[in-house]
Amino acid sequence: MSKRDYYEVLGVHRNASETEIKKAYRKLAIKYHPDKNAGDKAAEDKFKEISEAYSILSDTQQRVIYDQYGHAGLNGGGGGGGSYSSGGFGGTPFEDLFGDIFGDIFGGRGSQRSRGRRGDDLRYNLSINFEEAAFGLETKIQIPRHQTCGTCDGIGAKPGTTPRVCPTCQGAGQVRVQQGYFSLTRPCPECNGEGQIIDQPCEECHGSGRVRGKRTLSLKIPAGVETGSRLKLSSEGEPGLNGGPPGDLYVVISVQDHPLFQRDGQHVICEIPISFPQAALGCELEVPTLTEKVNVKVTPGTQSGKVIKLQGQGFPSLQGYARGDQLVVLRVEVPTSLTDRQKELLEEFAKEGGEEIHPMGKTFFDKVKELFG
């Protein structure tokens, strides 16, 4: 069975604002919530359907994908250097719904959320390579987000008209009601907590004062970042509502693995294989670093695991301190196959050093016979 259109599920048009989508979701979620419809399977299925629709349409990036590709687009994967999400680092549709309800009960919160509200924080995941993390880079990123409507300058009203003060709450956005012994503050039902009423909404933004768009930002990544490093761009998140301040943008770094190097704090680790003759006799190796190749001397008699330090060839700290070092770890490789001549030479080498050779010529059963007679 094919899924219904998410906009149809919530009962909103495809150009609905974030506020309109949230309002529709809250209304339906309260109506079909399982706690209110115990044992009603149809209500439970309806609640799941509207929750799924809201989880997609309330997420800026997911909504863009859905608008362009429909349900099929949400099942695919993405690629590229960056990904985007809205709403900062927490928050769910259920928190929005029940946070508003409890805010209504205890008073005050409904007005704070609806009048002069701060815009949502945004998160952008940026993938960079190992060298870029070591030396920093300047790049551009494109963020899908809402922008102030250019037709109505963010007012939400049709050009040439202005919103009027709500006659019920006198612009306060909330009303006080008496329930038993309690005096409760609720969002004004006349203006939905906005404090004003728009009789002729702007046709471009449908009264929200915001339109969907994209913003290109120049970004400077400092040298020394690592996976999980977070850069904050103040006021580059979603614009606020009703004159509220914009949110912030957080760029979260992910550093790609390198085929040769590993990172340990400020140090770079590089394992270099050498042969037994090179280790025994000494040699000179050409070793790669983050910037160039350098020559390294291996002293005679070098053991596997020896570390050679290349000073200043590592990562800087984010505080601007000196760079760490590159640690070259030498790994002596033992040959897995030998020619007859090579075997003879090694046997001579061992005898010359007074070592006794025990070739693995005897089978397991030969050893058993010798042991038990």
UniProtKB/Swiss-Prot annotation:
The keyword Transmembrane does not apply. Binds 2 Zn(2+) ions per monomer. SMART domains: DnaJ. GO terms for cellular component: cytoplasm. Keywords: Chaperone, Cytoplasm, DNA replication, Metal-binding, Repeat, Stress response, Zinc, Zinc-finger. The keyword Cell division does not apply. Zn(2+) 2 binds at residues 166, 169, 188, 191. GO terms for biological process: chaperone cofactor-dependent protein refolding; DNA replication; protein refolding; response to heat. Pfam families: DnaJ (PF00226), DnaJ_C (PF01556), DnaJ_CXXCXGXG (PF00684). One of its GO terms (molecular function) is heat shock protein binding. It comes from the Bacteria. It is found in: Cytoplasm. Participates actively in the response to hyperosmotic and heat shock by preventing the aggregation of stress-denatured proteins and by disaggregating proteins, also in an autonomous, DnaK-independent fashion. Unfolded proteins bind initially to DnaJ; upon interaction with the DnaJ-bound protein, DnaK hydrolyzes its bound ATP, resulting in the formation of a stable complex. GrpE releases ADP from DnaK; ATP binding to DnaK triggers the release of the substrate protein, thus completing the reaction cycle. Belongs to the DnaJ family. PANTHER family: CHAPERONE PROTEIN DNAJ, DNAJ HOMOLOG 1, MITOCHONDRIAL-RELATED. This is Chaperone protein DnaJ. The lineage of its organism: Bacteria, Pseudomonadati, Thermodesulfobacteriota, Desulfuromonadia, Desulfuromonadales.
